[in-house]
Amino acid sequence: MAKKKATFICQECGYQSPKYLGRCPNCSAWSSFVEEVEVKEVKNARVSLAGEKSRPVKLKDVDNISYHRTQTDMSEFNRVLGGGVVPGSLILIGGDPGIGKSTLLLQVSTQLANKGTVLYASGEESAEQIKLRSERLGDIDNEFYLYAETNMQAIRTEIENIKPDFLIIDSIQTIMSPDITGVQGSVSQVREVTAELMQLAKTNNIATFIVGHVTKEGTLAGPRMLEHMVDTVLYFEGERHHTFRILRAVKNRFGSTNEIGIFEMQSGGLVEVLNPSQVFLEERLDGATGSAVVVTMEGSRPILAEVQSLVTPTVFGNARRTTTGLDFNRVSLIMAVLEKRCGLLLQNQDAYLKSAGGVKLDEPAIDLAVAVAIASSYKEKPTSPQEAFLGEIGLTGEIRRVTRIEQRINEAAKLGFTKVYAPKNALQGIDISQGIEVVGVTTVGQVLKAVFS
């Protein structure tokens, strides 16, 4: 067992004090001190459950077979992780309350129980409550263990007894170590419990999933160090009033950080959405103004999404701008370009923009679709339902090239689109599917003239 010493650290500058201070003497910040625990390692502190101490090995002698990924029955979940669950990995999943984090992990756990032993430790629900929720997810394998406990030492004891292949902690803010002062969810408790879980996962090849709460700003609650300690950080996103959920990787040591998985919450649990483009566009109205379609890339997957805009004359002194699912600063930049380079008088217009379906669009390739949607609403002229738009807009009004242009265009062709406006200088040497017309453009003014003339 490690020797622990409590100290107080300023979260602004890192100044340390043996006692709590209301104001930091180094940076003058108020109420910035939190209790931390200094851990001094003692001999033989970090060993596996079998009592084996870790030793240095040559890189060429490391057995790759021990890191064979375990596949779940959900291809969307496997994609986000980089191809499956890696033994010994520490995976942190965050999301808003009620978004479905526990449902997702319970569903994944039931599938992993067919391929190994699963220990599901919950500090938020009793075993009876979890059993009630699991009944709608299908049959449960015998190798699925439930444990309602908040004491980390007790959880460690059961890990030593059961020796699971997969461990689920729901949630990290409810687990506490009796060796550390402080309430559940405090900075010192979260950090120490995570460190112990990391040691257990790495020394015993236990794939560990940790549920983390988020703050009102949408970031993971607890110390920032929590995200640095784990191997993978996933965010489970979605509007509470929509059935669609998006699992997004923001850190992944074993795969890409650009992949997303899309699910739909149904009465029987989460169901994969294998063709998200069709889902996001199925409710689009033909002939509606203020609508444009873009082919966005989420990792290696092209997805067609709809950008909607509503431009109305302002009745107040200052025009109002509102965005949902789009970057506010990017929208403001595009509106400034439209006003300066294309002659659209938008300074006295309110503008409300959103991405339909709750998907977040934040890559430069959406610029042209945003500009067309704004112009469509302003001019009261609809776009063709078979047209899509690709391209980044520069401050001089030029259309810049985007990545994976060929893959984007072919995806639009698969879904029945007949025309795509794309950067002209990005179309050389690409293989385009039959039945789709690709219009190379150089300026945003050229696009607006072609679409609305």
UniProtKB/Swiss-Prot annotation:
Motif RadA KNRFG motif positions after renumbering to this chain: 251-255
Q: Where on this chain are zinc fingers (C4-type) annotated?
A: 10-27
Q: Which UniProt keywords apply?
A: ATP-binding, DNA damage, DNA repair, DNA-binding, Hydrolase, Metal-binding, Nucleotide-binding, Stress response, Zinc, Zinc-finger
Where does the record place the region Lon-protease-like? Answer: 350-453
Give the Enzyme Commission number: 3.6.4.-
GO CC terms of this entry:
cytosol
Q: What SMART domains does UniProt report for this protein, alphabetically? A: AAA
Which positions bind ATP? G95, D96, P97, G98, I99, G100, K101, S102
Could you provide one GO biological process annotation from this protein's UniProt record?
A: recombinational repair
**Organism domain of life:** Bacteria
Question: PANTHER family under this entry?
Answer: DNA REPAIR PROTEIN RADA, DNA REPAIR PROTEIN RADA-LIKE PROTEIN
Q: Which protein family is named in the record?
A: Belongs to the RecA family. RadA subfamily.
Q: What is this protein called?
A: DNA repair protein RadA
* Species per Swiss-Prot/TrEMBL record: Streptococcus pyogenes serotype M3 (strain ATCC BAA-595 / MGAS315)
